[in-house]
Regions:
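Acidic, glycine-rich active-site loops and adjacent beta-strand->loop/helix elements
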Residues: 12-15, 53, 158-161
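Gly/Pro-rich interdomain helix-loop hinge
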Residues: 144-223
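Glycine-rich phosphate/pyrophosphate-binding beta-alpha loops
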Residues: 15, 120-153
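A general structural signal for well-ordered alpha-helical segments in protein cores
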Residues: 67, 94, 134, 153-154, ...
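Carboxylate- and glycine-rich phosphate/diphosphate-binding segment that chelates Mg2+/Mn2+
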Residues: 20-129
Length: 229
């Protein structure tokens, strides 16, 4: 086995969790495609996660990378491969990110610290179980339109959550709870699923993520769908 060079990772954004995952992405600019590569030998040998190193991020980058981290946590929690240990990581990550991202965008110390921890925990979870179609579609939007990855994830996540809702059992109740929604135990299945989706969408709006991607053309839809498959 050919191992990569030893790497000490010091992340400067709170989103991808590249410092703790076995995944990396290669973009083919000519074919307008992104390829996800998975290799346990590509993990850093040491990760130094210091929120002070993230404090220079502008608001837009803080918001988009933070929503990427939230997408990791929610998709990891609802993927078919999820199990008890990864559920523990993902729910805690959702909780931390939900309470931290707004203040991180405002460059508050507590928010930066929370996001540094939340994205790291989410990475520990999804690296073991994979992600979902929000990410596959976000990769396609990034490859074709150069949409920032976190922005694409944030735009796709509520839509995908709604699409997947009937296949998630009671998990959206715990997502809603982790997002800070009150009274979820008194809600019907339909109510807590809607509450979870609405809370995610509202967080995205609150941190300034756009809700529309005007670059998409109807003629591109077949290619986008095939690329995201």
């Amino acid at each position: 086995v050919n191992r990569g060079m030893p790497v000490i990772a010091l992340p400067t954004t709170a989103g991808t969790a590249a410092e703790v995952t076995i995944n990396y992405v290669i973009t083919d600019v000519e074919r307008k495609r992104k390829f996800v590569c998975v290799d346990p030998h590509d993990m850093p040998i040491i990760a130094i996660v210091d929120p002070d190193m993230m404090s220079s991020m502008p608001k837009g980058l803080t918001a988009s990378t933070g929503m990427d981290a939230l997408t990791h946590a929610i998709e990891g929690y609802t993927t078919k491969a999820a199990w008890e240990m990864t559920d523990m990581f993902h729910l805690k990550a959702i909780e931390i990110i939900a309470r931290s991202l707004r203040s991180a965008v405002a460059n508050e110390k507590e928010g930066r610290e929370g996001m540094a921890l939340g994205e790291y925990i989410a990475g520990m979870g999804f690296s073991n179980v994979g992600l979902g179609i929000a990410h596959s579609m976000a990769h396609t939007l990034g490859a074709v339109y150069d949409t920032p990855h976190g922005v694409a994830c944030a735009m796709m996540l509520p839509i995908v959550m709604e699409y997947n809702a009937d296949c998630t059992g009671e998990k959206y109740r715990e997502i809603a709870r982790a997002m800070g929604v009150k009274g979820v135990d008194d809600m019907s299945v339909e109510e807590y699923r809607k509450a979870a989706i609405d809370a995610v969408a509202q967080l995205s709006v609150d941190v300034g993520i756009p809700t529309k991607l005007e670059a998409i053309k109807e003629d591109d839809l077949d290619f986008l769908a095939e690329s995201a498959h």
